[in-house]
Amino acid sequence: MNFDVVIIGGGLAGLTCGIALQEQGKRCAIVNNGQAAMDFSTGSIDLLGRLPNGENVQKVDRALAGLSEQLPAHPYAKLGAERVLAKAKQFEGMAAKLNLGLAGSVEQNHARVTPLGGLRRTWLSPDSVPTVRPNEAFPYNNIVILGIEGYHDFQPQLLADNLKLQPQFAHCEIKPGFLTIPELDFLRRQSREFRSVHIAQTLEQKVNPASLINEIRQAASGADVVFLPACFGQNSQAFFNELQAATDFMLFELPTLPPSLLGGRQHNILRQYFERLGGVMMNGDRALRAEFEGNRVVKLFTRIHEDEPLAADNYVLASGSFFSNGLVAEFERIYEPVFGADIVQTERFDPSDHFTWTTRRFSAPQPYQSAGVVINTDCRVQKCGRFFDNLYAAGAVIGGFNGIELGCGSGVAVVTALTVADEIAEKSGG
């Protein structure tokens, strides 16, 4: 099977790259092994929240120079500040066109409310999630936080207690409460099934919206704004928007323990748009190995296509990190399993020395979290010290940074994905 581009990985990086290439007339296939990290995410997209020295970032454009000095191996440092900001703005345009429902701007980070009542800096958040700008108070006074009776993945009292400690919410009266929703009783009897996905399915299929709206109104009497767990609308925000339109107060939703409906909604929209553009999703397939000629990849063998390998002019490795088996750790080494790409090595981290992978303090950032493949300024992948001509990397499979520590994981995904799409299009005259 022949394509212009074969992409390994159907997460945020893979789909963003695939959409950008399909829009430029390329014929793309995505080899997708299963659920992506997006399905477990909060739905917010971080560009850069913190520098390696611990300094918090409000304006990303002012922080990129410091990032390059402190961490020259970071993908942003390799791409350059101008390109990073341009690709971030390009993704904002893509998100608006696809109606991903994201709010925020590359001009300045905002803070989103976390499920535990904290505030976390981020770049883009679902517009249904409560957020505050730096040094500004939350614009409402009376907040009611409503959980669902028997649903333990969202704790209104804990959220309320912690939120009261935040200066931006010091002026607010915050009350916790619960919704009963009798139609969920059959799920309550099966605690393993009482999760956000199953709740959302039941609410959309079996619950009378009028009775649900009435219960929310009664439980939130006197409130200016109501916080709900993100269980109202599985594949889109439409059901949540219907509830919002029928009530007299503002509704916001907060992500729950995984699986996350907020990230899953975005994943569905991206995947469906990629397929509408003519892209091919090879779901349930897994890349196994590749065949090379010099510095070029010529064939990709997958679990389903072992006898008839995939062939393409260019290949994109967007397989993610350890979570999705884009990287594999054994006792003596960390490696990339499909192409055998070189793994980033730093002063603190050696992929072949197990004792450098962790630090003594469990809660501290761990060196192994910065593991990933080596790329150049074009996002081409290195193997045995030489860069491939037609193999690129995007997203968490790239090494040299800790996305959790720096608050940049999803930003790296979209910035590198759009960079790769540009490189491939320019090379082939697209």
UniProtKB/Swiss-Prot annotation:
Catalytic activity: a quinone + sn-glycerol 3-phosphate = dihydroxyacetone phosphate + a quinol
EC category: oxidoreductase
Pathway the protein takes part in: Polyol metabolism; glycerol degradation via glycerol kinase pathway; glycerone phosphate from sn-glycerol 3-phosphate (anaerobic route): step 1/1
Keywords: Flavoprotein, FMN, Oxidoreductase
GO-annotated molecular function: glycerol-3-phosphate dehydrogenase (quinone) activity
UniProt entry tagged with the keyword Flavoprotein: yes
Family designation: Belongs to the anaerobic G-3-P dehydrogenase subunit B family.
Summary of the function given for this chain in its UniProt record: Conversion of glycerol 3-phosphate to dihydroxyacetone. Uses fumarate or nitrate as electron acceptor.
PANTHER family: ANAEROBIC GLYCEROL-3-PHOSPHATE DEHYDROGENASE SUBUNIT B, FUMARATE REDUCTASE
Name of the molecule in the record: Anaerobic glycerol-3-phosphate dehydrogenase subunit B
Organism name: Actinobacillus succinogenes (strain ATCC 55618 / DSM 22257 / CCUG 43843 / 130Z)
